[in-house]
């Protein structure tokens, strides 16, 4: 199963890298990562990667959505990655 904490530990984590990753995942350029974008998270980094399961997506969203609006903003994403 997918573990976002392990993924981020393996990835470079400078502030610039984190922001670049955020904007890659934010496919519709809304300034937020929504649930449908989060589901396809791994595919942004590897073309043949699987989609996250509904449970993995919900867990990831809950971990990153500190204000409870159902989306992950750039500041929330940075806090999640740096955790």
Swiss-Prot record:
UniProt-recorded Gene Ontology molecular function terms: calcium ion binding
Keywords (A to Z) from UniProt: Allergen, Calcium, Metal-binding, Muscle protein, Repeat
Domain of life: Eukaryota
Positions of Ca(2+) 2 binding: 65, 67, 69, 71, 76
Entry-linked InterPro entries: EF-hand-dom_pair, EF_Hand_1_Ca_BS, EF_hand_dom, Parvalbumin
CC terms in the record's Gene Ontology section: cytoplasm
Domain (EF-hand) ranges: 13-48, 52-83
Keyword Nucleotide-binding part of the UniProt annotation: no
Binding site for Ca(2+) 1: 26, 28, 30, 32, 34, 37
Family annotation (Pfam families): EF-hand_7
Family: Belongs to the parvalbumin family.
Function of the protein: In muscle, parvalbumin is thought to be involved in relaxation after contraction. It binds two calcium ions.
Additional information: Is regarded as an important allergen. On the 2D-gel the determined pI of this protein is: 3.75, its MW is: 11.35 kDa.
Name of the featured protein: Parvalbumin beta 3
Organism encoding this protein: Macruronus novaezelandiae (Blue grenadier)
């Amino acid at each position: 199963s997918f573990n976002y904490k392990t993924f981020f530990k393996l990835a470079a984590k400078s502030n610039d890298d984190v922001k670049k990753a955020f904007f890659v995942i934010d496919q519709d350029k809304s300034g937020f990562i929504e649930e449908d974008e989060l589901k396809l998270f791994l595919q942004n980094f590897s073309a043949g990667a699987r989609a996250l399961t509904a449970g993995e997506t919900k867990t990831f969203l809950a971990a990153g959505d500190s204000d409870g609006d159902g989306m992950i903003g750039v500041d929330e994403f940075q806090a999640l990655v740096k955790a």
